[in-house]
Amino acid sequence: MARLGLCGGQGSIGESGLIAMAVVSFADPLTERLVAFVRSVGIEVRATTLPDKTFLPGLDIRNGAILVDEERLTHPGDILHEAGHLAVADPAERLAPKLSPDGGDELTSIAWSYAALRHLDLDPAIVFHDRGYKGGAAALIENFAAGNYVGVPLLQVYGMAAEPKRAAASGVEPYPHMLRWLR
């Protein structure tokens, strides 16, 4: 299949691994809202049919884009978590065929996801649902609500957010406010 279409299209993956696409919206309003936000920060999202099983149902990251199979997507909030992986990735690695985040990137993408939820004024359970985070979603929600943020030190190192002391010294809003959404 030839690669067609624009950012945000729908398509299917052919034998060559290329994606044929046409521009469409998502049927689920929450999915559409999350995708619109992710695109607004500069991350490409494509609606497609994923032929293979993926780590998160209905989602994959390829070549710097999030692929969403809405028929197989079980938790729309996972879109924000996957976007977090791309957002905090080293820009030189972001467009790799397959992204390989390390442990620090996982924590940082969790922090990025929470900041996105707060920015969108959404319930944290949308991302931190009971089927994710190895049973630790409730603890993440509780810790974030108490101001105990994981992953924020790396967001600060990347210049994406500031912890309270640095924010006060710099005259900027502290995390969960983001100074920028992409590393």
Across the structure, where does each feature detected by a protein language model lie?
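Pan-zinc metallopeptidase signature
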Residues: L140-R183
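Domain-level detector for trafficking modules
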Residues: A125-E142
